[in-house]
Every structure is written in C-alpha cells, then in structure tokens.
Regions:
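Structural detector of well-ordered beta-strand residues that form the stable sheet scaffold
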Residues: 55, 80, 101, 154-155, ...
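PLP-dependent aminotransferase-like
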Residues: 69-158, 165, 391
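Conserved active-site segment immediately N-terminal to the catalytic lysine
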Residues: 156-191, 218-223, 288-289
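PLP-dependent aminotransferase class I/II
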Residues: 9, 38-44, 48-52, 115, ...
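Phosphate-binding glycine-rich loop
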Residues: 29-78, 92-96, 101-104, 169
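Hydrophobic/aromatic ligand-binding patch that stacks against planar heteroaromatic rings
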Residues: 92-93, 146, 170, 187, ...
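A short alpha/beta connector and helix-capping loop motif
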Residues: 111-120, 169-178, 373-383
Length: 397
C-alpha cells in the first residue's frame, strides 16, 4: 500500500467541476489582478472568521511581511517569536531590519507560551508573533496581556490554522492582525501561492491594502513604499470554490486524528511501545508521544505530528513501506546559519531542539481511509521496534 503525506488528487477529484467553473468565470472576465473575485473571497473569509477586514495577499509570507510593515516594524525594533516554526516567521522580521528575539516552546503544544514571551520582552519590542503551529492556537490571553504591558502589536501567524479556535476567539482575529497561507498543502489551499491578512482595525486594513499595491490607493500615486503582495483572481476563484468544503475537511482531519489516537492506543502495547505525554527533552526509544490538544481548543490538524525515539530510522522505514512523512522542522531558527549573528548556540532552546530531532508528521488529509491509517500505524510501530543494524566488529559503538 502507498499512503502519501498529502493527496491533493483525491481532493480535486471531488471538487473538479466547481473549481473549473470558477476558473472559467475569471478567464471570461479577464480580470486577473484584484477585482470582484478577490473582493468576494475576502468578504467570505472575513465573515467566516468574524474579522472586520480580510486583505488578500500573494502568499502567507507576504501576509506576515505586510502585517509587520503595517505595524511599523523596522530597523532597531525587536520582535518576539518562537524559535520553532516555518522560516518566514523570523525571516520577515529580518527582512525589515528588525531583530527576531527568539523564545523556546511548550513541550506539549510546541507553541510559545505567554510566560516565555513576557520574559523575552525588551524596551525595543515593537511586535510579538505567536505561531499557531500545526493548526492549534497558542494560548493567547497571557500573550495579549504581555503585549499590553509593553505596548507591542500582536500579529498572529495563523498560516497553518484557518478555522482553529479557543475561548479567546478564532485564529487570526484575536491579535491586531493575523496572517494566513493558502499554499496547496494548507487546509484551504490554492493552486499555487496565496495568503491573506485579517484585522479588526480600519486604519490597519487601509494600510495593508496600500502596502500590497506598492503603497498606492490611486494608480501611480504612491503614499508609502509597499510591495507587490496582491492575491490574483485565479487563486481567489479556486479558494472561493473550495471554501464551502472547509467545514467537512476540517471535521475529516479531526476525525482522522481521533482515529490515530485509538489505533495507536490499541496497537502500541502489543509491540512494546509506550504512549506518553511529550517531554521537554528528547523522546526515549520505545516511546511515542501523540499530539496534545489543549482543552477547549478546536485543533484543525494541518499536520499530525508525533514525537518518537529513533525518528530518522522510523522515517527511513516509512519510506520503505510507502508511507509519506515529513519533519516540520529539522532546524530551529537559532541554529540557522543566516541568523548566526544573533549569537545563539546549541542548548539555548532545548525544547525546540528536542522537537527538531524527534518529531514526525504523518498523513492526516481528510480523504484518508481507515485501512490507510491502520497501515500507517502498523508501519510506525514496526519502524520503532525494528532491530538496530548490527555494528561491525571493530567499529566504534
């Protein structure tokens, strides 16, 4: 059996007529840049999330970059963010000449905590970027409280978390702004790059719209220097066609996560694998930690990330078995060569480093069958219990 990490063909087969009609309508209109198709999509997403404004952007990266620019982040400013995320979270800060002030993550959720963020604030802190990693919201009230004491702008990195929610609200609507990605692998994915920035502030919304179009509200008359961050109409058409299916897809992901938990709980003890809560250090051999879901949270499972001993050996075994998997992410920001001037070293953020060494994303797309999930579970457990290769005589242990 082959089980890919993501099967976009299975999704497209079910929605093909809707998507092709939407694309044909844009082609007939010949309105490819912004225009009514993009505006309709923005209004639909804003209404869905409960945001006053949704501004379509060319990618999740540009959605985050534009939010930072709208917040006035620039040289000499500090921006606090977790060291464990997709590169753009810190990369956008760096591009504006500001300094990413990195914090470690909670071992259970791999999200930054309010306590860690509060401890990292400096007199120069202009913004805070909490990340809703893998589809689960960070605990926002303590983060918002820390930001209020500092007077810092909170920009949510919700790129993996559309429709995620907790008692504080919906991802992307709790802080001053929220950034979303519509990369094809996301729960709501386009046919290429796309993104969106949300806000409840009218002034920030106007600034975001200026920034995405080179700072011009009127063509060739530029109030500020922006960029070309526009969401094109073809992507907006695809996303609009997909949007009515998102509830069912999210429910499918959550159901698959629950089934994984049941299947691992059923099968792991019989092969000598222990299920345990995530720990701050590396996961020991023979131990498997399933994703932790905070009480009262709607986790949308863009990724189903387990932590386990001998991760690389298990990953290799899964490749042999035809099971797709991926490491999100193998190198935390503080150990990236491009951020060497920040002065960090290995050991500074041990929880993120441990997760980078033992985390593994398994297939979680909504079209997965029970048989496929059973196959994945069996393959993971077989990889965990596979005997280590014999060490040749005379070789170092």
């Amino acid at each position: 059996m082959q089980v890919p990490l993501l099967d976009l063909s299975a999704q497209f087969a079910r929605i093909r007529p809707d998507v092709l009609r939407a694309l044909e309508a844009v082609c007939d209109s010949q309105r490819f840049i912004l225009g009514p198709t993009v505006e309709a999509f923005e209004q639909a997403v804003a209404g869905r999330l409960g945001a006053a404004h949704a501004v379509g952007m060319s990618s999740g990266t540009d959605a985050l970059l534009a939010a930072l620019m709208a917040a006035g982040v620039g040289p000499g400013d500090d921006v606090v963010t977790p060291t464990y995320s997709f590169f753009a979270t810190a990369g956008c800060v760096w591009r504006l000449g500001a300094r990413p002030v990195l914090v470690d993550v909670d071992p259970a959720t791999l999200n930054a905590t309010g306590e860690a963020i509060a401890a990292a604030l400096t007199p120069k802190t202009k913004a805070i970027i909490p990340v809703h990693l893998y589809g689960q919201m960070a605990d926002m009230p303590p983060i918002l409280a820390a930001a209020a004491r500092q007077g810092a702008v909170v920009i949510e990195d919700a790129c993996q978390a559309i429709d995620a929610a907790d008692s504080s609200g919906t991802a992307g609507t709790v802080g001053a702004m929220g950034a979303f990605s519509f990369f094809p692998s996301k729960n709501l994915g386009g046919f290429g790059d796309g993104g969106l920035t949300t806000t409840n502030d009218d002034g920030l919304a106007r600034q975001l719209r200026l920034l995405r179009g080179h700072g011009a509200a009127t063509r060739y008359h530029h109030e500020i220097v922006g960029g070309n961050f526009r969401l094109d109409a073809l992507q907006a058409a695809v996303l609009t066609a997909k949007l009515p299916y998102l509830d069912a897809w999210t429910a499918g992901r959550r159901a698959n996560a629950a089934r994984y938990r049941a299947l691992f709980a059923e099968a792991a003890p019989g092969v000598g694998v222990s299920l345990a809560a995530p720990i701050a250090g590396p996961t020991p051999d023979g131990v498997l930690s399933l994703p932790f879901e905070r009480p009262g949270v709607t986790h949308v499972y863009n990724q189903f990330v387990v932590r386990l001993g001998r991760r690389d050996a298990v990953k290799a075994h899964l490749a042999e078995a035809g099971v797709g998997c991926e490491v999100y992410y193998p190198v935390p920001f503080h150990l990236q060569a491009c951020f060497a001037s920040l002065g960090h070293r290995r050991g500074d953020f041990p929880i993120a480093e441990a997760a980078a060494g033992d985390s593994l994303a398994l297939p979680i797309y909504p079209e997965l069958t029970e048989a496929q999930q059973r196959y994945v579970v069996d393959a993971v457990l077989a990889g965990m219990t596979r005997p280590r290769p014999a060490v040749p005589a005379g070789s170092p242990a």
